UniProtKB/Swiss-Prot annotation:
Alphabetized UniProt keyword annotations: DNA damage, DNA repair, DNA replication, Ligase, Magnesium, Manganese, Metal-binding, NAD, Zinc
Catalytic activity: NAD(+) + (deoxyribonucleotide)n-3'-hydroxyl + 5'-phospho-(deoxyribonucleotide)m = (deoxyribonucleotide)n+m + AMP + beta-nicotinamide D-nucleotide
Originating organism: Salmonella dublin (strain CT_02021853)
Protein name: DNA ligase
Membrane spanning stretches: none
GO BP term, example: DNA replication
Cofactor: Mg(2+); Mn(2+)
E.C. number: 6.5.1.2
GO cellular component: cytosol
Molecular-function GO terms, alphabetical: DNA binding; DNA ligase (NAD+) activity; metal ion binding
Function comment: DNA ligase that catalyzes the formation of phosphodiester linkages between 5'-phosphoryl and 3'-hydroxyl groups in double-stranded DNA using NAD as a coenzyme and as the energy source for the reaction. It is essential for DNA replication and repair of damaged DNA.
Domain BRCT: 593-671
Family, per entry: Belongs to the NAD-dependent DNA ligase family. LigA subfamily.
Binding sites annotated in the UniProt record for Zn(2+): 408, 411, 426, 432
Amino acid sequence: MEPIEQQLTELRTTLRHHEYLYHVMDAPEIPDAEYDRLMRELRELEAQRPDLITPDSPTQRVGAAPLTAFNQIRHEVPMLSLDNVFDEESFLAFNKRVQDRLKSTENVIWCCELKLDGLAVSILYENGVLVSAATRGDGTTGEDITSNVRTIRAIPLKLHGDNIPARLEVRGEVFLPQAGFEKINEDARRTGGKVFANPRNAAAGSLRQLDPRITAKRPLTFFCYGVGILEGGELPDTHLGRLLQFKAWGLPVSDRVTLCDSPQAVLDFYRNVEKDRPTLGFDIDGVVIKVNSLVLQEQLGFVARAPRWAVAFKFPAQEQMTFVRDVEFQVGRTGAITPVARLEPVQVAGVLVSNATLHNADEIERLGLRIGDKVVIRRAGDVIPQVVNVVLSERPEETRPIVFPTHCPVCGSDVERVEGEAVTRCTGGLICGAQRKESLKHFVSRRAMDVDGMGDKIIDQLVEREYVHTPADLFRLTAGKLTGLDRMGPKSAQNVVNALEKAKATTFARFLYALGIREVGEATAAGLAAYFGTLEALQTATIDELQKVPDVGIVVATHVFNFFAEESNRDVIGQLLAEGVHWPAPVVINVQEIDSPFAGKTVVLTGSLSQMSRDDAKARLAALGAKVAGSVSKKTDLVIAGEAAGSKLAKAQELGITVIDEAEMIRLLGA
């Protein structure tokens, strides 16, 4: 056997293995970018030796065989995949090939849309009624998922409108929005169920359940993008026209579809979508570019496994493979011990990544991770990089287990894990230097006591030199003592002292937030302050009384109660008040006297606002008698959803809570 023949055999075997894991087992071991690289390598070798191309090569077909656990449906029209381009030069070369094949000097009109990261499906309608649905499978035969697809509310069971064909096979992508993905994983962590690595895996796992009742509980959705069978009817002769016709019949279509009359316009579309990608609310991994004219599509035809008239222009990979060199353990403000993987640096989505959070001991166990393992790293938007999975088939022999500490890595105190919690915590409290540093950084932060100029490096030095042990010690600092710190001159030192003096005048809500009580964020602190009015009333509240506050359940109430029951915490509060920390007396709002649709309502804000800041919105809502909470519960009356709203919106919809957008909020604020 020639060396190139051996290389081809090995590449095909590797690709088939990963196709099986991806299409059949829904457990991909490598990122898409690595699969694409292997496929390009195989194509290049086969181009050198066309005589060695075999009919069963991965370049000659679409995917892997379907599971036998489902009935099979044979696609009357094969479901082909698309070829990929990864940079502007490759796209321009594709554009030139199309123009050359058409023998045209005029620009082609391109229809550009999003490349959704979900599961490709075909849905067959007969006389407008949904009769069957199937996965892509190997492109020729897919799995019968009719019962599961019927549970997806975005997909109509019956088309409406005129001129519906006798048989119409719609093709599109089933996917899971980010909010739904977060909700599924949140529920799984709480109940000990399966946690999905990404929305695509969650969508695939949800759609391919043998029990459709499970699928029905998952917030899947669907966009259509093409047609297979068409009998007893007609469709427009442009791709965009067909999408608009689908929409008229009640089928969901993405609103990010654009006609481009030049290669430059296509590149502009690509860049704009890439910029907007973090705010879409669902995962995409590129854009799809198709010749708009169906007549020209027919002229161009197909290659073995893909059309010549379309291409997927993929974004830089959000997943890459690297090695775990070590695992270190960080201690946070509340004593939570978080394992952090130290990685062989790798570029992911344009950023050099050398660390990734491992969350907790359960996550390490779920991954089956060992030091030295080859892993897949994912970075999406502003999310902290995380380890998606271990590439077990490439595990080195010299890996070693990760041993979770039994004592705090900073102060040596015992660690504990409360039953029912995933987090392991240091029991050292403020004697732990790490907890002390993080607690003080939180205390002086902008949304807490807002001490201007008191940065992290100053706090680190104050703790390391034993100048500060509690928040009250900050207000005892002098310019002389601060001048002794690194890079701190007399003027800077005096500015910090002045900022500390100014910070003494605060609000009750900010003060509560600054104390760093577990599970008490800004909104909960504001709710506690508004409900109890005074520190004395809050300190003496029972757990039952605390639960009467919007956004406060048994867990938060217990944390608040335990915090004030601790003598050392009451002592620090006393010292802070003695140093002059103060806030205005509470203003009692009689909501019955306020003429506003928000009066007396518990309101939750989610997503980003464009017309005003979140703080301004909270202040205006509170002034109109609303109780602004930080999370959605059965006590919530109204959710205001801005752009890229997340899991709070999903929970509100699940509970049947009224949801309005920012425009409606602004209208009601002026009512």
